[in-house]
Amino acid sequence: MARGLKKHLKRLNAPKHWMLDKLGGAFAPKPSSGPHKSRECLPLILIIRNRLKYALTYREVISILMQRHVLVDGKVRTDKTYPAGFMDVISIPKTNENYRLLYDTKGRFRLHPIRDEDAKFKLCKVRSVQFGQKGIPYLNTYDGRTIRYPDPLIKANDTIKIDLETNKIVDFIKFDVGNVVMVTGGRNTGRVGVIKNREKHKGSFETIHVEDSLGHQFATRMGNVFTIGKGNKPWVSLPKGKGIKLSIIEEQRKRDAAAQAAANA
């Protein structure tokens, strides 16, 4: 009878957004326990070997990590299967590169290059605000952080801006109608838009109606929405496409236009 955690993960059972080859082997890296869920993270080995192409093999990845070249959220990480997740900042000082893990409009993780100034902070969604022993207030974030004595105005589902050097809250964004959000779950993962309406349903999920910059409207659950800026200005730079999901016909037209431009050139 099985006891404890499984230490292996079959490749066919790995999340689709890891984009692993079916025929590349029987197994996939099993994410370690950490700040993100195993189905909502990207292990460091896949970032270094499969995405950044700094290593060809498992052993080369271990060699790079053991030389303490890779930082996640400003801390050196040597665990090859450390689970990096949404909004995490991956830094490689040796090459002066910084990346932020974001979603593209197809729900896949995208390593988005950022400047050194942007790598000094991170946005975190507040899961809950509670009171501990002796009435000390504290909040929990989506990535497992616990921060004591937060601003009394910060509530659940708001977003806080954290300085990664001091781990202090620098600023916060209220979860309000009119603010820009990114969807982090469901069929609309990776889409960016402004909150237009909140529908409260007793005993069920709250529904959030979002409109992107092209005027397309869609709805999703409250738990799938992550506020990334005040008004329509995001506090983090966004990947190519700015979180706008095109229809199949619009994508085809865009490809045809690019092919025509290349032919004329």
Curated annotation (Swiss-Prot):
Q: Where is the S4 RNA-binding domain?
A: 42-104
Q: Which Pfam families match?
A: 40S_S4_C, KOW, Ribosomal_S4e, RS4NT, S4
Task: Please tell me whether the keyword Ribonucleoprotein is annotated for this protein.
Answer: yes
**Keyword annotations:** Cytoplasm, Ribonucleoprotein, Ribosomal protein, RNA-binding, rRNA-binding
Question: Could you state a single Gene Ontology molecular function term?
Answer: rRNA binding
Q: Which family does it belong to?
A: Belongs to the eukaryotic ribosomal protein eS4 family.
Please identify the protein, giving its name as recorded.
Answer: Small ribosomal subunit protein eS4
Q: Which organism is it from?
A: Zea mays (Maize)
